[in-house]
């Protein structure tokens, strides 16, 4: 009985103190995923803003250096990503979601590439 009481007390303390209660491997919804996971998240949805470093309207991809520089426009979306068990989710914030099996990922880049404008030196 004492063990059960202490277990419940520990769970309540975690909730009050805001400590994570999720098991290792889960990722709560965020628009700033861990740096070491950018390679994964930015491969399957490269239009997320957290994948790009922009300065003066010109953006370069943080992960894939071979990607062309682009002009900052509506191609870049404010994504939130999350992982729960083996379910990876991209929330584009406008009611559009891309959900995939984390161990069998499916890219969701094509619909967004239509809005991408590649930077040309003449654009200055």
From Swiss-Prot:
Any single Gene Ontology cellular-component annotation: host cell endoplasmic reticulum-Golgi intermediate compartment
Keywords: Early protein, Glycoprotein, Signal, Virion
InterPro entries named in the record: ASFV_fam_110
Localization of this protein: Virion; Host endoplasmic reticulum-Golgi intermediate compartment
Span(s) of short sequence motif Prevents secretion from ER: 121-124
Induction: Expressed in the early phase of the viral replicative cycle.
Pfam families from the UniProt entry: v110 (PF01639)
Disulfide bonds: none
Residues bearing glycans: 64
Keyword match Signal: yes
Signal peptide: 1-18
Superkingdom of origin organism: Viruses
Functional note: Causes the redistribution of lumenal ER protein to an enlarged ERGIC compartment.
Family: Belongs to the asfivirus MGF 110 family.
Protein name from the UniProt record: Protein MGF 110-4L
Organism in which the protein naturally occurs: African swine fever virus (isolate Portugal/Lis 57/1957)
